[in-house]
Regions:
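Conserved alpha/beta-hydrolase
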Residues: 26, 31-55
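Catalytic nucleophile-loop/oxyanion-hole region of alpha/beta-hydrolase
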Residues: 21-23, 50-80
Length: 275
């Protein structure tokens, strides 16, 4: 787990829960933008990914392992005693929503980028039929997940970096896949249990990883008086890495600034600092 403090007076602290297969190092741009605009950042690699144990790459015992990591990061964030927000990306969004269905968290709002509520059903990643046909296999047996860097973003610079990134996972266990699948279904079945709070929900309309229809269903069922929603036309899964990522970060920072403003922190409309 790492901490990055704001470059000026802190308005709040943002805990980031990242996506499947990736790691903290892919968020340098997002972290820099948050810090320059007055937000501390807390982030770590999720279990089985990034710089965590080599022996357990692409494997978790149960989904609660993810919950525990997020709760640990929130505990550290709350030590600042300022407004706290969570940014959940893909799998990180699923972790946050599933946890919120079970407990109330000490946060003022959440931001969801392409939350993983249902995977795209295409030839590359339709592993559910394959798994069901195999029957009982070792939970440690790994398969190629089939997520290609070019499917994540239209940003060719990021694609090249991802291709050459030794910390990116390519394989995961069938147990991990089944756990994710079961959790997605469970989360969609209990949306009404999520505590209402200011929420920013975004996805790209050309997402090749998750089925955005499930995100739309979540949007309709989630009961909150303050929901900011943006479907980025033509964007891929990682909207925060797209060539237009400056626009995406401005949207995120506007949400955060509006929220902290409501809580009593005065923020000027033109205060957003670009890189």
């Amino acid at each position: 787990m790492w901490k990055w403090e704001a470059e000026n007076d802190a308005k709040g602290v943002v805990v980031i829960a990242h996506n499947i297969l990736e790691h903290t190092g892919r968020y340098a741009y997002v972290i820099t933008m948050l810090r320059r605009n007055g937000y501390h950042v807390i982030m770590g690699d999720l279990p089985g990914q990034g710089q965590t144990s080599r022996a357990n790459k692409g494997q978790i015992e149960n989904f609660q392992t993810y919950h525990e990591s997020l709760l640990d990061w929130l505990k550290i964030a709350n030590e600042y005693k300022i407004l706290t927000y969570v940014l959940g990306v893909g799998l990180g969004g699923l972790i946050l929503l599933n946890l919120l269905e079970k407990v109330e968290l000490p946060i003022e709002g959440m931001m969801l980028i392409s939350p993983m509520l249902e995977l795209q059903k295409n030839g590359k990643n339709r592993k559910d039929k394959l798994v069901s046909n195999i029957g009982k296999i070792s939970k440690d047996t790994r398969f190629n997940v089939g997520v290609e860097p070019k499917d994540l973003t239209r940003n060719l610079e990021i694609v090249e970096e991802t291709v050459n990134d030794g910390l990116m996972l390519k394989k995961a266990t069938y147990h991990w896949y089944n756990t994710i699948n079961e959790t997605m279904k469970d989360t969609m079945a209990h949306i009404h249990d999520i505590q209402p709070m200011p929420t920013l929900l975004m996805y790209g309309t050309k997402d090749l990883i998750v089925d955005t229809r499930a995100i739309d269903e979540f949007k309709e069922k989630y009961q909150t008086p303050e929901l900011y929603f943006k479907a980025w036309q033509g964007f891929y899964h990682e909207v925060h890495n797209e060539p237009e990522r400056d626009e995406v970060m401005r949207y995120i920072l506007t949400f955060l600034n509006n929220s902290v403003n409501t809580m009593g922190f005065i923020v000027e409309d033109d205060e957003i600092v670009e890189i």
